Amino acid sequence: MAERFTRREVMQAGLALGAAAALPGLGCSSEGGDEVRPPGPLGQIDTFVVLMMENRSFDHYLGSLKLLEGRALDGLVGGESNLAPDGSTVASFKLDDFTVEDPPHGWNASHAQWNGGANDGFVKAHAGPAQNDVMGYHVRAQLPTLYQLADSYTVCDRWFASVMGPTWPNRFHLHAGTSEGMQSNNPVLGLRSIFHQLEEAGISAANYYHDIAFAAGGYRFTKGLRKIEQFFSDAAAGRLPRFSIIDPAFGGDGANDDHPDHDIRLGQALMASIHAALAASPQWDRMLFVLTYDEHGGFYDHVAPPTITESHPGFEQLGFRVPTVVAGGRVKRGAVLSAQLEHTSVLATLTRRFGLSPLNARVAAATDLAECLDPALVMPGMQVQPATVITPVELPLSALRGRFRARRRPDDEPHRELIEAAARVLPREHYRVAESAAITARVLAEGARLGAVRVR
């Protein structure tokens, strides 16, 4: 079992990381050469960063923006419900539990929840003592970082998971625009991803990770792996690559990926820390930061997902909506984008920005993220707006530690497949599952140093 983190460890980690951050930087421009800029708004963006979290639906996390705050987006309106197995009605409600049980969200369960577009099978799919949780929604006080980012930048209220199924196929679509027909959490060997394509084009890219890099466990790609600690120093020095995917801590006592039943307060602290590091980076003015989730995790959403053109049978059906915010110095402020998007939209954006050939027809057809950019801020020479200062996340470590002591068992790990797959292919220095708590302590220390987190 991983060692639990303490407030002292967070503070000690902060001293060490602060000293490292004080070292001279190597420059203030992203790695990757002087490629030709395309015309249009994307030509003003040099650096793309994606933080993909785990297993939450749009209504579950951001639906209350409309229901309780009146925000003009496609959220909850009140009266949403599903039937329980006994025929009783379960209405949507405010969920007070930060660590709910993990609802089913595999291929078959997700399709049962969808039920041909009725979206009425969520409670039945999670039948049992915790079945009502899937109709629960969180509010601003529980998700302070996400809600402030949604206030400050562009919320995408029609960003769908790429697959109506679990984590791996959806993350494959972020990386490669396909899972090659894989419906479950299993490796796809030989997958050609955006990392391969950027490497061949001489454009820098990295998979920053806490305990495990998905690229390594998912399809055995081990080039460009960088530890999350290096992300903070790279951001401060202006040395982030052209494209980065940030993987949260998937396992152990430091898990901060938002996958149930991991504590969502650690997820808020991670988001705040990443945003603060990016906002303070010399690269912020020409950056696009995408915060999204891989899939809905079995939680209710009222929007029936659409279909697209796809060569693999069954994969033309998109998954449920996931919470997504696009941030950056040139992004529209306080906006809502309702264009149909999915994880492959990230690849479409990179393809058009860097003049790449689309990885496949799905990437070629996907809508890119250019509409998130403010036309007034993408004209050459225009001054960008400063980053929003996010209120620090108050993190009660004592409460988190108490919960882990009460819960942790070896068979509780929701990412067992990824951990086992990574163990088979990763060099020892990149397999850090046993260090999960210490790694997250170092990330929290960075967040505290940047003023994004207060540990108590």
Question: Where are the predicted features?
Answer:
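N-terminal pro-sequences and low-complexity stem/linker regions of secreted or lumenal proteins
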Residues: 2-5, 9-456
